[in-house]
UniProtKB/Swiss-Prot annotation:
Metal-binding is among the record's keywords: yes
Family annotation (Gene3D superfamilies): Aconitase, domain 3
HAMAP family linked to this entry: LeuC_type1
Catalytic activity: (2R,3S)-3-isopropylmalate = (2S)-2-isopropylmalate
One of the GO BP terms on file: L-leucine biosynthetic process
Quaternary structure annotation from Swiss-Prot or TrEMBL: Heterodimer of LeuC and LeuD.
Protein name, UniProt field: 3-isopropylmalate dehydratase large subunit
Family: Belongs to the aconitase/IPM isomerase family. LeuC type 1 subfamily.
Enzyme's top EC category: lyase
Pfam family, one: Aconitase
GO MF annotation terms: 3-isopropylmalate dehydratase activity; 4 iron, 4 sulfur cluster binding; metal ion binding
Length: 460
């Protein structure tokens, strides 16, 4: 009998009933909510006369609609209604939350790990497609729809069919200037946005082992762009060191670690599909089109038109085959989002822009992903570095990742963005998004166009 993967072990721990290959009832350890996908679910509870079964296992954040200049100046009626309704709902149903304007407020996928609620071995859901971020800690974590949010509210359970298992092994040593964002963008560019459909993706290998938790979260965050709603990594000493001392970790932390160590995938675990990628061969990645698979490394020209999707993408983006990333005339820079708005991301960008000025006629904003990150960054002077360079230093929130708040890229303008999606109109009507690492975005802010960060002395 072959060994088990970490996913197998976690799945088995959480099955309540049901046969393999059929929908199985799973117990949910942690339910994260935010203002966009929860209002109808709460109303469904009211209509049925139900309560939240485990408010102690539920945690709310305010992030998608929050303005980042004056956080309380919410002018869009729908956004204000969603913010106000969540504030009412968490009080009515007794749910702890990082309230709007509080010292813990931030993007849900940052607040969970920061507070220690995200822990190895947990089964985590949230009404948000980037919930796979939490898989970096050795959890089953994925996004759910609003009707499922209501089901979890009422029962603390969810019906799920166990997916197939894919192993993605990152090997080798990266060149300087290559980061975990490049790993995941390169994977998606090579294998496509549908490769992970129907699979849980386990990321491992020597290149993963060397990453910090913040870098690991970047990879798991974009599992959904690879087609998989779940990404997972094995917990290790890096995981435990990150978690130790955080607010919500188990009181007997050493005992918890002893249990978490048993979750690691067995050496003889079997997978339905295996992909290996040598990161030593990677160059900085930039997307040129309108889905995350439409990306190239800095050294490679944009591809020839292969199908109608390429043709439409080139038309929308105002680009053509044979051009290169350095040819893109950028107008906006966005450093933020649940993909790359952690302290280490901001430190990396600050090293590159320190003592320099952003290119004329370019707008550049930095949005810390949470208030704790903002405070930590300001404590070491990152805010001053960015502001001296000409960046706008904002309050925490989802910001320009998506057009659901005042932060939008103008129609027709190209934006270098550290976020996770480059769909048409994602950052605002007519916005042209180019996904990249924080280093690439910061360097582009200074030059006005993409440059090869491998050649910069500030890059390690």
């Amino acid at each position: 009998m072959s060994g088990k993967s970490i996913f197998d072990k976690l799945w088995d721990r959480h099955v309540i009933t049901g046969d393999e290959g059929q929908p199985q009832l799973m117990y949910v350890d942690q339910h994260y909510i935010h203002e966009v996908t929860s209002p109808q679910a709460f109303q469904g509870l009211r209509d049925a006369g139900r309560k939240v079964r485990r408010p102690d296992l539920t945690f709310g954040t305010f992030d998608h609609n929050v303005p980042t200049v004056n956080i309380f100046d919410i002018r869009d009626a729908i956004s204000k209604a969603q913010i106000d309704k969540l504030a009412e709902n968490v009080i009515e149903f007794g749910i702890d939350n990082a309230s709007h304007g509080s010292d813990k407020q931030g993007i849900v996928h940052m607040v969970g790990p920061e507070t220690g609620r995200t822990q190895p071995g947990k089964f985590i859901v949230c009404g948000d497609s980037h919930t796979a971020t939490h898989g970096a800690f050795g959890t089953i974590a994925f996004g759910i729809g609003t009707s499922e949010v209501e089901h979890v509210f009422a029962t603390q359970t969810l019906w799920q069919v166990k997916p197939k298992k894919m192993l993605v092994e990152f090997t080798g040593n990266p060149q300087k200037g290559i980061y975990s964002k490049d790993y995941i963008l390169a994977l998606i560019a090579k294998y496509g946005v549908a490769c992970g459909v129907g699979y849980v993706v386990e990321y491992r290998g020597e290149a993963i082992d060397r990453l910090t938790m913040e870098e690991r979260m970047t990879i798991c965050n974009m599992s959904i762009e690879f087609g998989s709603k779940m990404g997972i990594m094995n917990p290790d000493q890096t995981t435990y060191d990150y978690m130790r001392g955080r607010e919500c970790v188990p009181e007997d932390f050493d005992a918890a670690v002893a249990d978490w160590k048993t979750l690691v995938s067995d050496d003889d675990a079997e997978y339905d599909k295996v992909i290996r990628m040598d990161v030593s061969e990677l160059a900085p990645m930039v997307t040129w089109g309108t889905n995350p698979s439409m990306g190239v490394d800095f050294d490679t020209p944009f591809p020839e038109v292969r199908d109608m999707n390429d043709e439409r993408a080139y038309h929308y983006m105002g680009l053509r085959p044979g051009q290169k990333a350095e040819d893109i005339n950028l107008g906006y820079i966005f450093i933020g989002s649940c993909t790359n708005a952690r302290l280490s991301d901001l430190q990396l960008a600050a090293r590159i822009v320190k003592g320099k000025k952003i290119s004329p006629n370019l707008t550049a904003i930095v949005v810390p992903g949470s208030r704790p990150v903002k405070r930590a960054a300001e404590k070491i002077g990152l805010d001053k570095i960015f502001k001296d360079a000409g960046f706008e230093w904002r309050e925490p929130g989802c910001s320009m990742c998506l057009g659901m708040n005042p932060d939008k890229v103008p129609d027709g303008v190209h934006c270098a963005s550290t976020s996770n999606r480059n769909f048409e109109d994602r950052q605002g009507f007519g916005a042209k998004t180019h996904l990249c690492s924080p280093a690439m975005a910061a360097a582009a802010a200074i030059s006005g166009h993409f440059v090869d960060v491998r050649r910069m002395p500030e890059v390690q």
